[in-house]
């Protein structure tokens, strides 16, 4: 808030007179002022630091800078800024996000690692100047590191994973998505020193083979989350070892791993009863047989992405409706064998009334307005995708809205085709995206 005083615009912080500030400082002990300042964000702290010398000292006290997120300032953050922050915060800093800060490189992060040895959570997602040298620094100075995000740091190699293994034994969560130089050798080195890993994001690590998963399955019994999206070389052999070695697994993304078959679903059903999230989009070899085993054994499923699992039929939906009462999000996009009958079972199932929030049915050509009738009793339903469902009508959507007035319906409808022009030119036809 800014106020005009004698023609001069001043911020609320600048409106404090010396006497006002002196009263506050006199009435409240330093410890209490520090406690108040600890609730302020980075921008507000910097503003407070400009009020007076006393507040400058309080605002810039290292204890107020335990958690810093610089994403909103990513274009302005250069290495020297990180170095200055590290010198000011020192051992107080526990969590730092430099996501998207393209100007930050190895030298600045070495200074940071030397000064902030109690760091526990570090996000370097998209810091493309980062190389193995940064992980070497973290290994040398930051032994308390628990969460590290190196996604899209494409210069990272197996050497980084070896360094982390040697110096960061408490590591629980690591994201090296799109670090496509990483191979099974790096994974082997990592898991031997970081056996407490709970979350591992390997999306787009296209060189990884089944051997890498065997190392994970053998050394990471605490693993809860694993993302293998578009790891194209992965097969049943590798994923089965994960299922057998990681019984606490709750979230698995294998979207784009087109080599996997029902053997994976059987292994998950037999070994991972706590599974909550399964993403297997574009895994076209999966069938009703595998999903039947999965549904009958994994009753805690909450989110399933089955996009382009083109072999599944209503049988899968029947099993989910019976055995998965917690299901909240279900994607069936491009599952062209799904019919109104499957949606009827889902709408009458255990998850329907209080749990189901999102269902994606785009490009399911057999779905009609009858499916919308079956879903009207799903009172928690927030969004439904109906793009390119040619048998869905505006009238059907309108009827659904009478029962679920707050639902977001996404659908395509072709506009009315205009009459031929007098000049006889070729008729044009367009499809418009209408967000209903």
Curated annotation (Swiss-Prot):
Organism taxonomic ancestry: Eukaryota, Metazoa, Chordata, Craniata, Vertebrata
Protein's job: Substrate-recognition component of the SCF (SKP1-CUL1-F-box protein)-type E3 ubiquitin ligase complex. Role in neural transmission.
InterPro entries membership: F-box_dom (IPR001810), Leu-rich_rpt (IPR001611), Leu-rich_rpt_Cys-con_subtyp (IPR006553), LRR_dom_sf (IPR032675)
Record-level GO BP terms: behavioral fear response; regulation of protein catabolic process at presynapse, modulating synaptic transmission; regulation of synaptic vesicle exocytosis; SCF-dependent proteasomal ubiquitin-dependent protein catabolic process
Record has Thylakoid as a keyword: no
Domain F-box, first and last residues per copy: 22-68
Location within or outside the cell: Cytoplasm
Residue numbers of Phosphoserine PTMs: 421
Keyword Repeat appears in the UniProt entry: yes
List of residues that carry Phosphothreonine: 417
Subunit structure: Interacts with SKP1 and CUL1.
Repeat (LRR) residue spans along the chain: 74-100, 101-126, 127-152, 153-178, 179-204, 205-230, 231-256, 257-282, 283-308, 309-334, 335-363, 364-388, 389-414
Cellular component annotations (GO), alphabetically ordered: cytosol; glutamatergic synapse; presynapse; SCF ubiquitin ligase complex; Schaffer collateral - CA1 synapse
Keyword annotations: Cytoplasm, Leucine-rich repeat, Phosphoprotein, Repeat, Ubl conjugation pathway
Primary site of residence: cytoplasm
Pfam (any one): F-box-like
Protein name, per record: F-box/LRR-repeat protein 20
Organism in which the protein naturally occurs: Homo sapiens
């Amino acid at each position: 808030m800014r106020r005009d005083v004698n023609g001069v615009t001043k911020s609320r912080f600048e409106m404090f007179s010396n006497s006002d500030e002196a009263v506050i400082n006199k009435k409240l002990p330093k410890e209490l002022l520090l406690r108040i300042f600890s609730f302020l964000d980075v921008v507000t702290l910097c503003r407070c630091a400009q009020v007076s010398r006393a507040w400058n000292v309080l605002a810039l006290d290292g204890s107020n800078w335990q958690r810093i997120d610089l994403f909103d300032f990513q274009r302005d953050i250069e290495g020297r800024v990180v170095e200055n922050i590290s010198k000011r915060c020192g051992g107080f800093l526990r969590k730092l996000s430099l996501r998207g800060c393209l100007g930050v490189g190895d030298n600045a992060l070495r200074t940071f690692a030397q000064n902030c040895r109690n760091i526990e959570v570090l996000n370097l997602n998209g810091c493309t100047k980062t190389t193995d040298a940064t992980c070497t620094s973290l290994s040398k100075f930051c032994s308390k590191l628990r969460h590290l995000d190196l996604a899209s740091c494409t210069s990272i190699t197996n050497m980084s994973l070896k360094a982390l293994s040697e110096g960061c034994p408490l590591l629980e969560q690591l994201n090296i998505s799109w670090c496509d130089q990483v191979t099974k050798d790096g994974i082997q080195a990592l898991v031997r020193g970081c056996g407490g890993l709970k979350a591992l994001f390997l999306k787009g690590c296209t060189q990884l083979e089944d051997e890498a998963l065997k190392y994970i399955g053998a050394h990471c019994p605490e693993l809860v989350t694993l993302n293998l999206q578009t790891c194209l070389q992965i097969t049943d052999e590798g994923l089965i070892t994960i299922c057998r070695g990681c019984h606490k697994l709750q979230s698995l993304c294998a979207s784009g791993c087109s080599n996997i078959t029902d053997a994976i679903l059987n292994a998950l059903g037999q070994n991972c009863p706590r599974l909550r999230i399964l993403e297997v989009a574009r895994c076209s070899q999966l069938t009703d047989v595998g999903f039947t085993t999965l549904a009958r054994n994994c009753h805690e499923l909450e989110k399933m992405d089955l996009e382009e699992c083109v072999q599944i039929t209503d049988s899968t939906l029947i099993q989910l409706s019976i055995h998965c009462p917690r299901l909240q999000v279900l994607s069936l996009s491009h599952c062209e064998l799904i019919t109104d009958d499957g949606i009827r079972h889902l709408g009458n199932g255990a998850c329907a009334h209080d749990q189901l929030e999102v269902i994606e049915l785009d490009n399911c050509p057999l779905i009609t307005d009858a499916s919308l009738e079956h879903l009207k009793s799903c009172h928690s339903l927030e969004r439904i995708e109906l793009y390119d469902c040619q048998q869905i009508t505006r009238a059907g959507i309108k009827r659904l809205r009478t029962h679920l007035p707050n639902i977001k319906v996404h659908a395509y409808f072709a506009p009315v085709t205009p009459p031929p022009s007098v000049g006889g030119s070729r008729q044009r036809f367009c499809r418009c995206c209408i967000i209903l």
